[in-house]
Regions:
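Helix-coil boundary/capping segments in enzymes
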Residues: 1-142
Length: 142
């Protein structure tokens, strides 16, 4: 279930932050558009449990959506997934679907949501297949 905005951040606060940071840097570097997403490993999926990971992903992805809506000519939204060390990929599939419905064009898939413990199977393992199947079906719709 989607969570409400956390914390309550106004559009003006988002604009101010983006214009003094990301947009300023883009202009300084001569770029006019960027893929906008959190780094999967920096989102600390190994902290907390699956429910924490889901809420954290929803809140972050909702903020990314807002940024992309405020500056659609600059930010292309890419989502983070609620990966958690002991969770299967169902939560990630559900969040991917939610984000695709919001207009996201991609996602960050963390091959090691265990935070450096490498407890997950390699990306070629069947564990990942349900996610790949969903991703492929989405790609075919585009």
């Amino acid at each position: 279930e989607p969570v409400g905005p956390y914390p309550d951040i106004s559009d003006d606060q988002i604009r101010e932050t983006l214009e003094t940071n990301q947009i300023r840097l883009l202009k300084e570097r001569g770029a006019d558009m960027t893929i906008f997403s959190p780094r999967a490993s920096a989102m600390a999926p190994h902290i907390g449990d699956e429910s924490v990971a889901r809420k954290w992903a929803q809140v972050n992805n909702d903020l990314i959506r807002r940024c992309a809506e405020l500056y659609p000519e600059i930010f292309v939204p890419v989502c983070m997934l609620p990966q958690s060390p002991k969770a299967d990929m169902q939560g990630s599939i559900e969040e991917l679907e939610r984000c695709v419905d919001m207009g996201f064009v991609g996602c960050n898939l963390n091959p090691d949501p265990g935070g450096g413990k490498f407890e997950h199977p390699p990306l070629t393992d069947e564990y990942w297949y349900p996610f790949y199947e969903k991703w492929s079906s989405w790609m075919c719709r585009r």
